[in-house]
Regions:
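Short, glycine-/small- and polar/acidic-enriched structural segments
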Residues: 35-173, 179-182, 198-201, 228
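N-terminal secretory signal peptides that target proteins for export/translocation
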Residues: 1-12
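Bacterial N-terminal signal peptides
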Residues: 15-28
Length: 345
């Protein structure tokens, strides 16, 4: 009798221990599932990219800290984002038409997917990058640039590619017919007015400088050279999207809510104050252009203009910048941002 009782007690204890262990595992699994996904997102220039201030307004990021945690990461240029993505140090890279093909074809990121739009040059008749000469230069047409010095922010950049395309249309070839120098965007006005270059590239906010407006003239725009340009869009690797789809849709929902808040004229004063604080600039510097038609186009639904992007990439191929064709649609996954936009209706 006593032996039977001892066996019963041992069995009961064993079963109880097993049950407790199973419950502990379930609790741990539940805790693991509840941990928000860390999403590191790269950005290069603000306010062209809103990533560093996306959720500065309280109440916009309703899923932040629940299903995901957004961590903005600054980079000096797009190639650095590609490197970070390659080694698993970045979940979202903000790339453009001029850098995306290199990520896929040169860096081996064949699984990189385009997931949401950021800014477009010349989209919906919004601002397009200016290529400017001095009013008294005597340069009236693109053909007049033969033998001249042209300034770009960097050889191989998107604005340099547009410059090459426009001049090639007039029969002018790089090195043979003109000289290209490099200069940062903030110095472009001085480069032009001091006579160091005959043509400069100017974009927001520098293009609205009163002295540049008074002494300079737009010879052509980037839209004139190549139509609408996909300057920046979000990309992520297919494997990360598959494992964290719900969190990604939540992030995109919050980001669309934030972009729409910034674009709403009713919020413009507060939006400018946020940017001014972050960039340590006076609000007056943004008032004439930010979040208006004088700014780059931002799609409120986050939809990438794939037709424009394909045209941009095809031009790169024609100019010999890339060595193989690339089908943008095969590398796009806009289902997530579409689902996010539906939630906001």
């Amino acid at each position: 009798m006593m032996a039977r009782c001892r066996r019963f007690a041992r069995t009961t204890i064993t079963r109880a221990g097993t049950l407790l262990a199973a419950m502990s595992l379930l609790l741990l699994a539940g805790h693991a599932r509840a941990e928000p996904v860390k999403i590191r997102a790269g950005w290069v220039v603000a306010p062209a990219s809103l990533i560093p201030v996306l959720f500065a307004k309280q109440g916009l990021a309703r899923h932040q800290g629940k299903s995901y945690v957004l961590e903005p990461v600054y980079f000096s240029a797009s190639p650095a984002q590609i490197t970070a993505m390659s080694v698993g140090e970045l979940e979202i890279a903000a790339l453009g038409f001029s850098s995306f093909p290199f990520a896929v074809q040169n860096a081996g990121l064949a699984d990189l997917r385009i997931i949401a739009d950021e800014i477009q040059d010349g989209g919906k008749d919004n601002f397009s990058t200016h290529y400017m000469v001095k009013k008294d230069s005597g340069i009236a047409t693109v053909a007049d640039l033969k033998g001249k010095v042209l300034a770009t922010n960097g050889v191989g950049t998107g604005v340099h590619m547009a410059m090459r395309a426009m001049l090639q249309r007039s029969g002018l070839q790089d090195k043979r017919d003109y000289t290209v120098i490099e200069a940062p965007f903030p110095t472009m006005k001085a480069v032009l007015l001091d006579g160091k270059a005959d043509l400069i590239v100017s974009t927001t906010p520098f293009v609205f400088d009163p002295e540049l407006q008074a002494k300079g003239r737009v010879l052509f725009t980037q839209r004139d050279a190549m139509g609408t340009s996909e300057l920046s869009f979000w990309t992520a690797r297919e494997g990360f999207i598959g494992k964290n789809r719900a969190a990604m849709v939540d992030l995109l929902e919050d980001s669309l809510r934030a972009v729409r808040w910034y674009l709403d004229p009713a919020n413009r004063t507060e939006a400018i104050e946020i940017l001014a604080r972050f960039l340590k600039q006076p609000p007056a510097r943004f008032e004439s252009w930010i979040f208006t038609r004088n700014d780059f186009y931002r799609d409120p639904d986050g939809l990438v203009n794939l037709e424009a992007l394909q045209s941009n990439i095809d031009l790169m191929r024609q100019l010999g910048i890339i060595n193989a064709d690339l089908d943008a649609r095969k590398h796009a996954n806009l289902e997530l941002v579409g689902e996010a936009a539906q939630r906001l209706k």
